[in-house]
Structures are given as C-alpha cells and as structure tokens.
C-alpha cells in the first residue's frame, strides 16, 4: 500500500536580483544552466518517479506572478540510461530561475513549494529563505582536487578491440546491426574531497555553449556539461538538436578548419548522423502537425571536439503532449545506443565493461504545464557521497567502416575534456 502524498502548494514571485548559484558557499540540490535559462534548486519538497512527474506537478496549485518558461513548480533530475522512467526527479523546496530572451531581456524569479497547510513566504521572505538557509558567502576559489589514482576496467586497447568486434559483427552476411555506440569507464580516486561548485564553474568556463547540470542520484551526484538537446517543449513548439559524427579540434586555425571540413564531407560520419536524425524524426512525427527536418547537417564546435548537428523543429498537434511523453519514444537515440535499437542494446550489454548508470541518460526539467528541456547526459561524471571518487564514461558511434584505433583516440579526447575540467591534469593518467 502506497502512502498518500502530503498536499503541496507553490508560489512564484519576481526578483530584481538573483545571485549566481555557483558562487554560493554550498552546492545546490539541482542545477540546470544553459545559455538563456538557469534553474537552480535547494532542498526537496517532493521526490517522485519520472513516470509520475507530470501528474505530481499538476496536483500542486501555484500562485505564479511571473508566468514565463520555467516558472512555477518544476521537477529536475537525471534519469538512468536503462529503464529511464524508473528514475526519480526532484521538486525543489526553493527554486531560483533566470531567463534571457533573444532581445536581451532578463527575468528573475523564485518559487517556493511546501505543505498546503503552511503559508508560503512573500517576495522578500522567499529570497531571504534561500540566501540564509543555503549560503550567503560567495565561494572562495577552491583548490582543484588531485587525482591520486585513476583506474579503468577497459583501457584504450581494450576499447579498440571492442570496436573491432562490433565492426566484424556488422560485416556478417546476416547482420542487421548498422550502428552501435560503445563506451568505456574510468574511475578516479581523488587526493581530497572535490568542491562540486568549483568543478561546475570550471565546466561552465570551458564549455559556455553547453548545458551545465548537477543532479542527485543514488549514492552521489551526477553532473556535467551536455552539448546535446534530446527534446524540448515550449508551449506548442518542439525541438531537438542531435549530435553524431565527431572529430577532435585542430591545434591551429588551419588544422581545425581542415578537420571540420573533413567532418562535413565524411560519408561515414554523415551516415552515422543520419541514423540519429531519422530516428528522432520518426519519434516526434506522430505528435506534430508540422516537423522541419533539414536535409544537411551543420558542424557544431566545442572546446575539444566538433560534431555534425541537425536542429529539428516542430509544432504539436491538437492533443496536449508533455515533454516527458515526447521523451519516451526517443530514448535511447542512435546517438547513444545505436540502430536498430534492440540489436545495439544487446551488443552493448554483452561487450561494455560495467553498467552505464546515468551516463547518456536524459537530464533536464519538466514544468507543471508540460514544458521542459531534456539533454543527453554525456560529458559527465558521477561523484560519490564523500566527494572523493569520480566515475566517468565516454565513447562514440561505431559503424561498418569505423577504425578501431581512431575510435579509441576519440573516446580518450572526450574523457579528457571532462577529466581535465574537473581534475586539471588528470588525463595524463589515461591509458
């Protein structure tokens, strides 16, 4: 028998000023920070399985004096790669939001969620409650933790061998597998406790065009800098921006331009990318009365790598559909699983070292009206509850003409991107 939840209510008020959440002396409970929108929450008003989030939010009446994207009660979380909707999301006790539109207009607000029989604070009280309960002192620059030991259940040579196995499997006459995304894990034991807020600041400084996130998961915190939008719903507008097909950035302007030009013209990378675009279009199509799917990808460059990317945009039909319902048929896309999905997931289960956990699972937020944004949880790490052990994973898409050594090198570049942002210099231990 499931105990009835305590009835909740919520209040959202405008703010004239909002401090940077990453400058507090303590880490927030949840963080979703992309160019144009920041949601940061403290405390837990409700912890609910993702499959029940829409109904739980709809049951929270809210006095919302702001009424913009992300205001009102929201649920945020990181969902596991496998059985994503069994994962949990958090409705924070206090949420501070900032939005910046295309015209440069900034809106700030705070939302409180609490038991329905207890009065919620007004504007000044709400702001003070957040500041005084969760930290008032700007964080001092924290010394970076050192990597005392780096271990892995699969080194680069083992990863290359796994890629070679996949290529051979695709070459069999009866093979139906066309693409599989493979990854390898790394575990870092730190010489001292990691300052999560400092690590997030370094990630944001290094990848300003990514979504910086930090979410509680069982036995720790899952955080990172995701470059890839799985799905967003803003009113009737739907969008997705998959990335697939990758090259390392060049060391000079010329070599970088050459690498990006080669990526744009690569038959192998374009085919790998198209599998993802077609799968997302097929998943979103039944919900949309209009869906724009560009025929040509663009090159999207980040600090260490460049990807092929395609932005899909659509308009929902008459039936109301929340972002979590849109998410369900999409995950895992061929960008993190493969195609056909059953064959790819079977190969992953039989060949990868260890469980993926939350790596490459959906990370994001959903509001009471069904709006929300979900990224793919790559370029990420999980920090244990003591703050002394990091677990990372990275990899890439494998198709019939993939080169195992090149794929192993690409995986190392992706691992190093996160490692060196979180624990500067740790990537020298990668093997």
Predicted feature locations:
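Soluble sensory domains of the PAS superfamily and closely related sensory modules
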Residues: 25, 66-69, 204-208, 352
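Contiguous alpha-helical scaffold segments within structured protein domains
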Residues: 1-15, 34-52, 101, 116-157, ...
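Conserved hydrophobic core element of enzyme catalytic domains
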Residues: 311-431
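A short glycine-rich, hydrophobically flanked beta-strand micro-motif that places a catalytic Asp/Glu
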Residues: 28-30, 76-79, 180, 212-215, ...
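Cofactor- and metal-binding active-site motifs of prokaryotic enzymes
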Residues: 2-137, 156, 216-230, 371, ...
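An anion-binding catalytic pocket shared by soluble metabolic enzymes
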Residues: 35-49, 83-94, 103-104, 184-271, ...
